[in-house]
From Swiss-Prot:
Induction behaviour: Expression is induced in response to 2-benzoxasolinone (BOA) exposure.
UniProt name for this protein: Aldo-keto reductase FVEG_12638
Effect of a null allele: Does not affect tolerance to 2-benzoxazolinone (BOA).
Gene Ontology CC annotation, any one: cytoplasm
Enzyme Commission code(s) on record: 1.1.1.-
Species of provenance: Gibberella moniliformis (strain M3125 / FGSC 7600)
Superkingdom per UniProt: Eukaryota
One Pfam family, short name: Aldo_ket_red
Functional summary from the UniProt entry: Aldo-keto reductase; part of the Fusarium detoxification of benzoxazolinone cluster 2 (FDB2) involved in the degradation of benzoxazolinones produced by the host plant. Maize, wheat, and rye produce the 2 benzoxazinone phytoanticipins 2,4-dihy-droxy-7-methoxy-1,4-benzoxazin-3-one (DIMBOA) and 2,4-dihydroxy-1,4-benzoxazin-3-one (DIBOA) that, due to their inherent instability once released, spontaneously degrade to the more stable corresponding benzoxazolinones, 6-methoxy-2-benzoxazolinone (MBOA) and 2-benzoxazolinone (BOA), respectively.
Binding sites annotated in the UniProt record for substrate: 122
GO molecular function terms noted in the UniProt entry: aldo-keto reductase (NADPH) activity
InterPro entries according to UniProt: Aldo-Keto_reductase, NADP_OxRdtase_dom, NADP_OxRdtase_dom_sf
């Protein structure tokens, strides 16, 4: 049973909350009024480790969170992470230039209404050397514009080099029982070696590991849903992966909890902070109460067998997006 984890000098409740789906990627574009109930439920439950980004909207996601925090006067109760590194208001390309970082933090602060606790570079730009981007990010910390800095979806080599230039506090990357690539590419091991916190996004497999999976065919996704472009969700891969998810579902039934709860409890058992997203208050409660699930050593071993044997089919991003991860 894991109820909190260390983040630098803090103890943060886990799991946290990923706000991306409120306004980006999953076919959703919620108004403030539509998003408020799930944010309020998170606050009421004590789920206070929140994640957003400039590109989720663009700008809209940060603004919704900022408006909510002002309305409920709850800044002191929340840990807020955001991200730059994508030219969201321009052409959408990946950029890590010092000027971009310097400019985007100001917009983040304006939309949130305060300085974020943690500021990431969202994707790594191969055209900007770390010797330019990391000092620029570090300067935000030195100026008090963020307390912690991090990288997202970088390689183990990049994380190590960046940390040699300036202290990196966190790395965010995809991790779930459905996606364990960072166990084998060295990223998790490198983060642990360097004492860098690993934040797991997509801990429910971007929808595979939910209780009432509503999609029966790849054509069932909304037109704007990014999963229409992801090989893992298309063609025969869809049906193969759906069968794998059913294997995890059987384990959850034996545990007498929901599939998301056992999936999140398993991520926590790996010592990683997860940030599952949802737009529904009841799902928020379901996710957060995964902290009450205690997996036995035998159950962890059983799930590990499923994870290691039932490998999902297809890439986790489309060809274009794959070029900007693991760099």
């Amino acid at each position: 049973m894991v109820k909190s984890m260390r983040f630098r000098d803090l103890e943060v409740p886990t799991p946290g909350f990923g706000a991306m789906g409120i306004s980006f990627a999953l076919g959703n574009d919620l108004s403030y009024e539509e998003a408020e109930p799930v944010l309020l439920k998170a606050l009421e439950q004590g789920c206070t480790f929140w994640d957003t980004a400039v590109s989720y909207g663009p700008g809209k996601n940060e603004k919704i969170l900022g408006d909510f925090i002002r309305k409920y006067n709850c800044r002191d109760k929340l840990f807020i992470a955001s991200k730059c590194g994508i030219a969201a208001f321009e052409d959408g390309s990946v950029t890590n230039s010092a000027e971009h970082i310097k400019t985007y933090i100001e917009g983040t602060i304006e939309r949130l209404g305060f300085t974020p606790d943690l500021y990431y570079i969202h994707r790594m730009d191969p055209n900007t050397p770390l010797e330019e981007s990391i000092p620029a990010l570090d300067s935000l910390r030195k100026q008090g514009k963020t307390k912690y800095i991090g990288l997202s979806e970088c390689s183990a080599e990049t994380l190590r080099k960046a940390n040699s230039i300036a202290r990196i506090d966190a790395v965010q990357a995809e991790y779930s029982a459905f996606e364990t690539i960072h166990e084998t590419d060295g990223l998790i091991d490198t983060a642990r070696e360097l004492d860098i916190e690993f934040i797991a996004y997509g801990p429910l497999g971007h929808g595979w590991l939910v209780e009432d999976f509503p999609y029966q065919t790849p054509e069932d996704f909304a037109p704007e849903d990014y999963r229409r472009q992801i090989p893992k969700w298309q063609g025969e891969n869809f049906y193969a992966n759906k069968r794998i998810a059913d294997g995890f579902r059987e384990l959850a039934k034996r545990k007498k909890c929901t599939l998301p709860q056992v999936a999140l409890a398993w991520v926590a058992a790996q010592g990683l902070i997860s940030i599952p997203g949802t737009t529904k208050p009841e799902r928020l409660v379901e996710n957060f109460t995964s902290r009450d699930i205690e997996l036995t050593e035998e159950e962890i071993k059983d799930m590990r067998k499923l994870v290691d044997v039932l490998k999902p089919q297809g890439d986790r991003y489309n060809e274009v997006a794959m070029r900007s991860i693991g760099k």
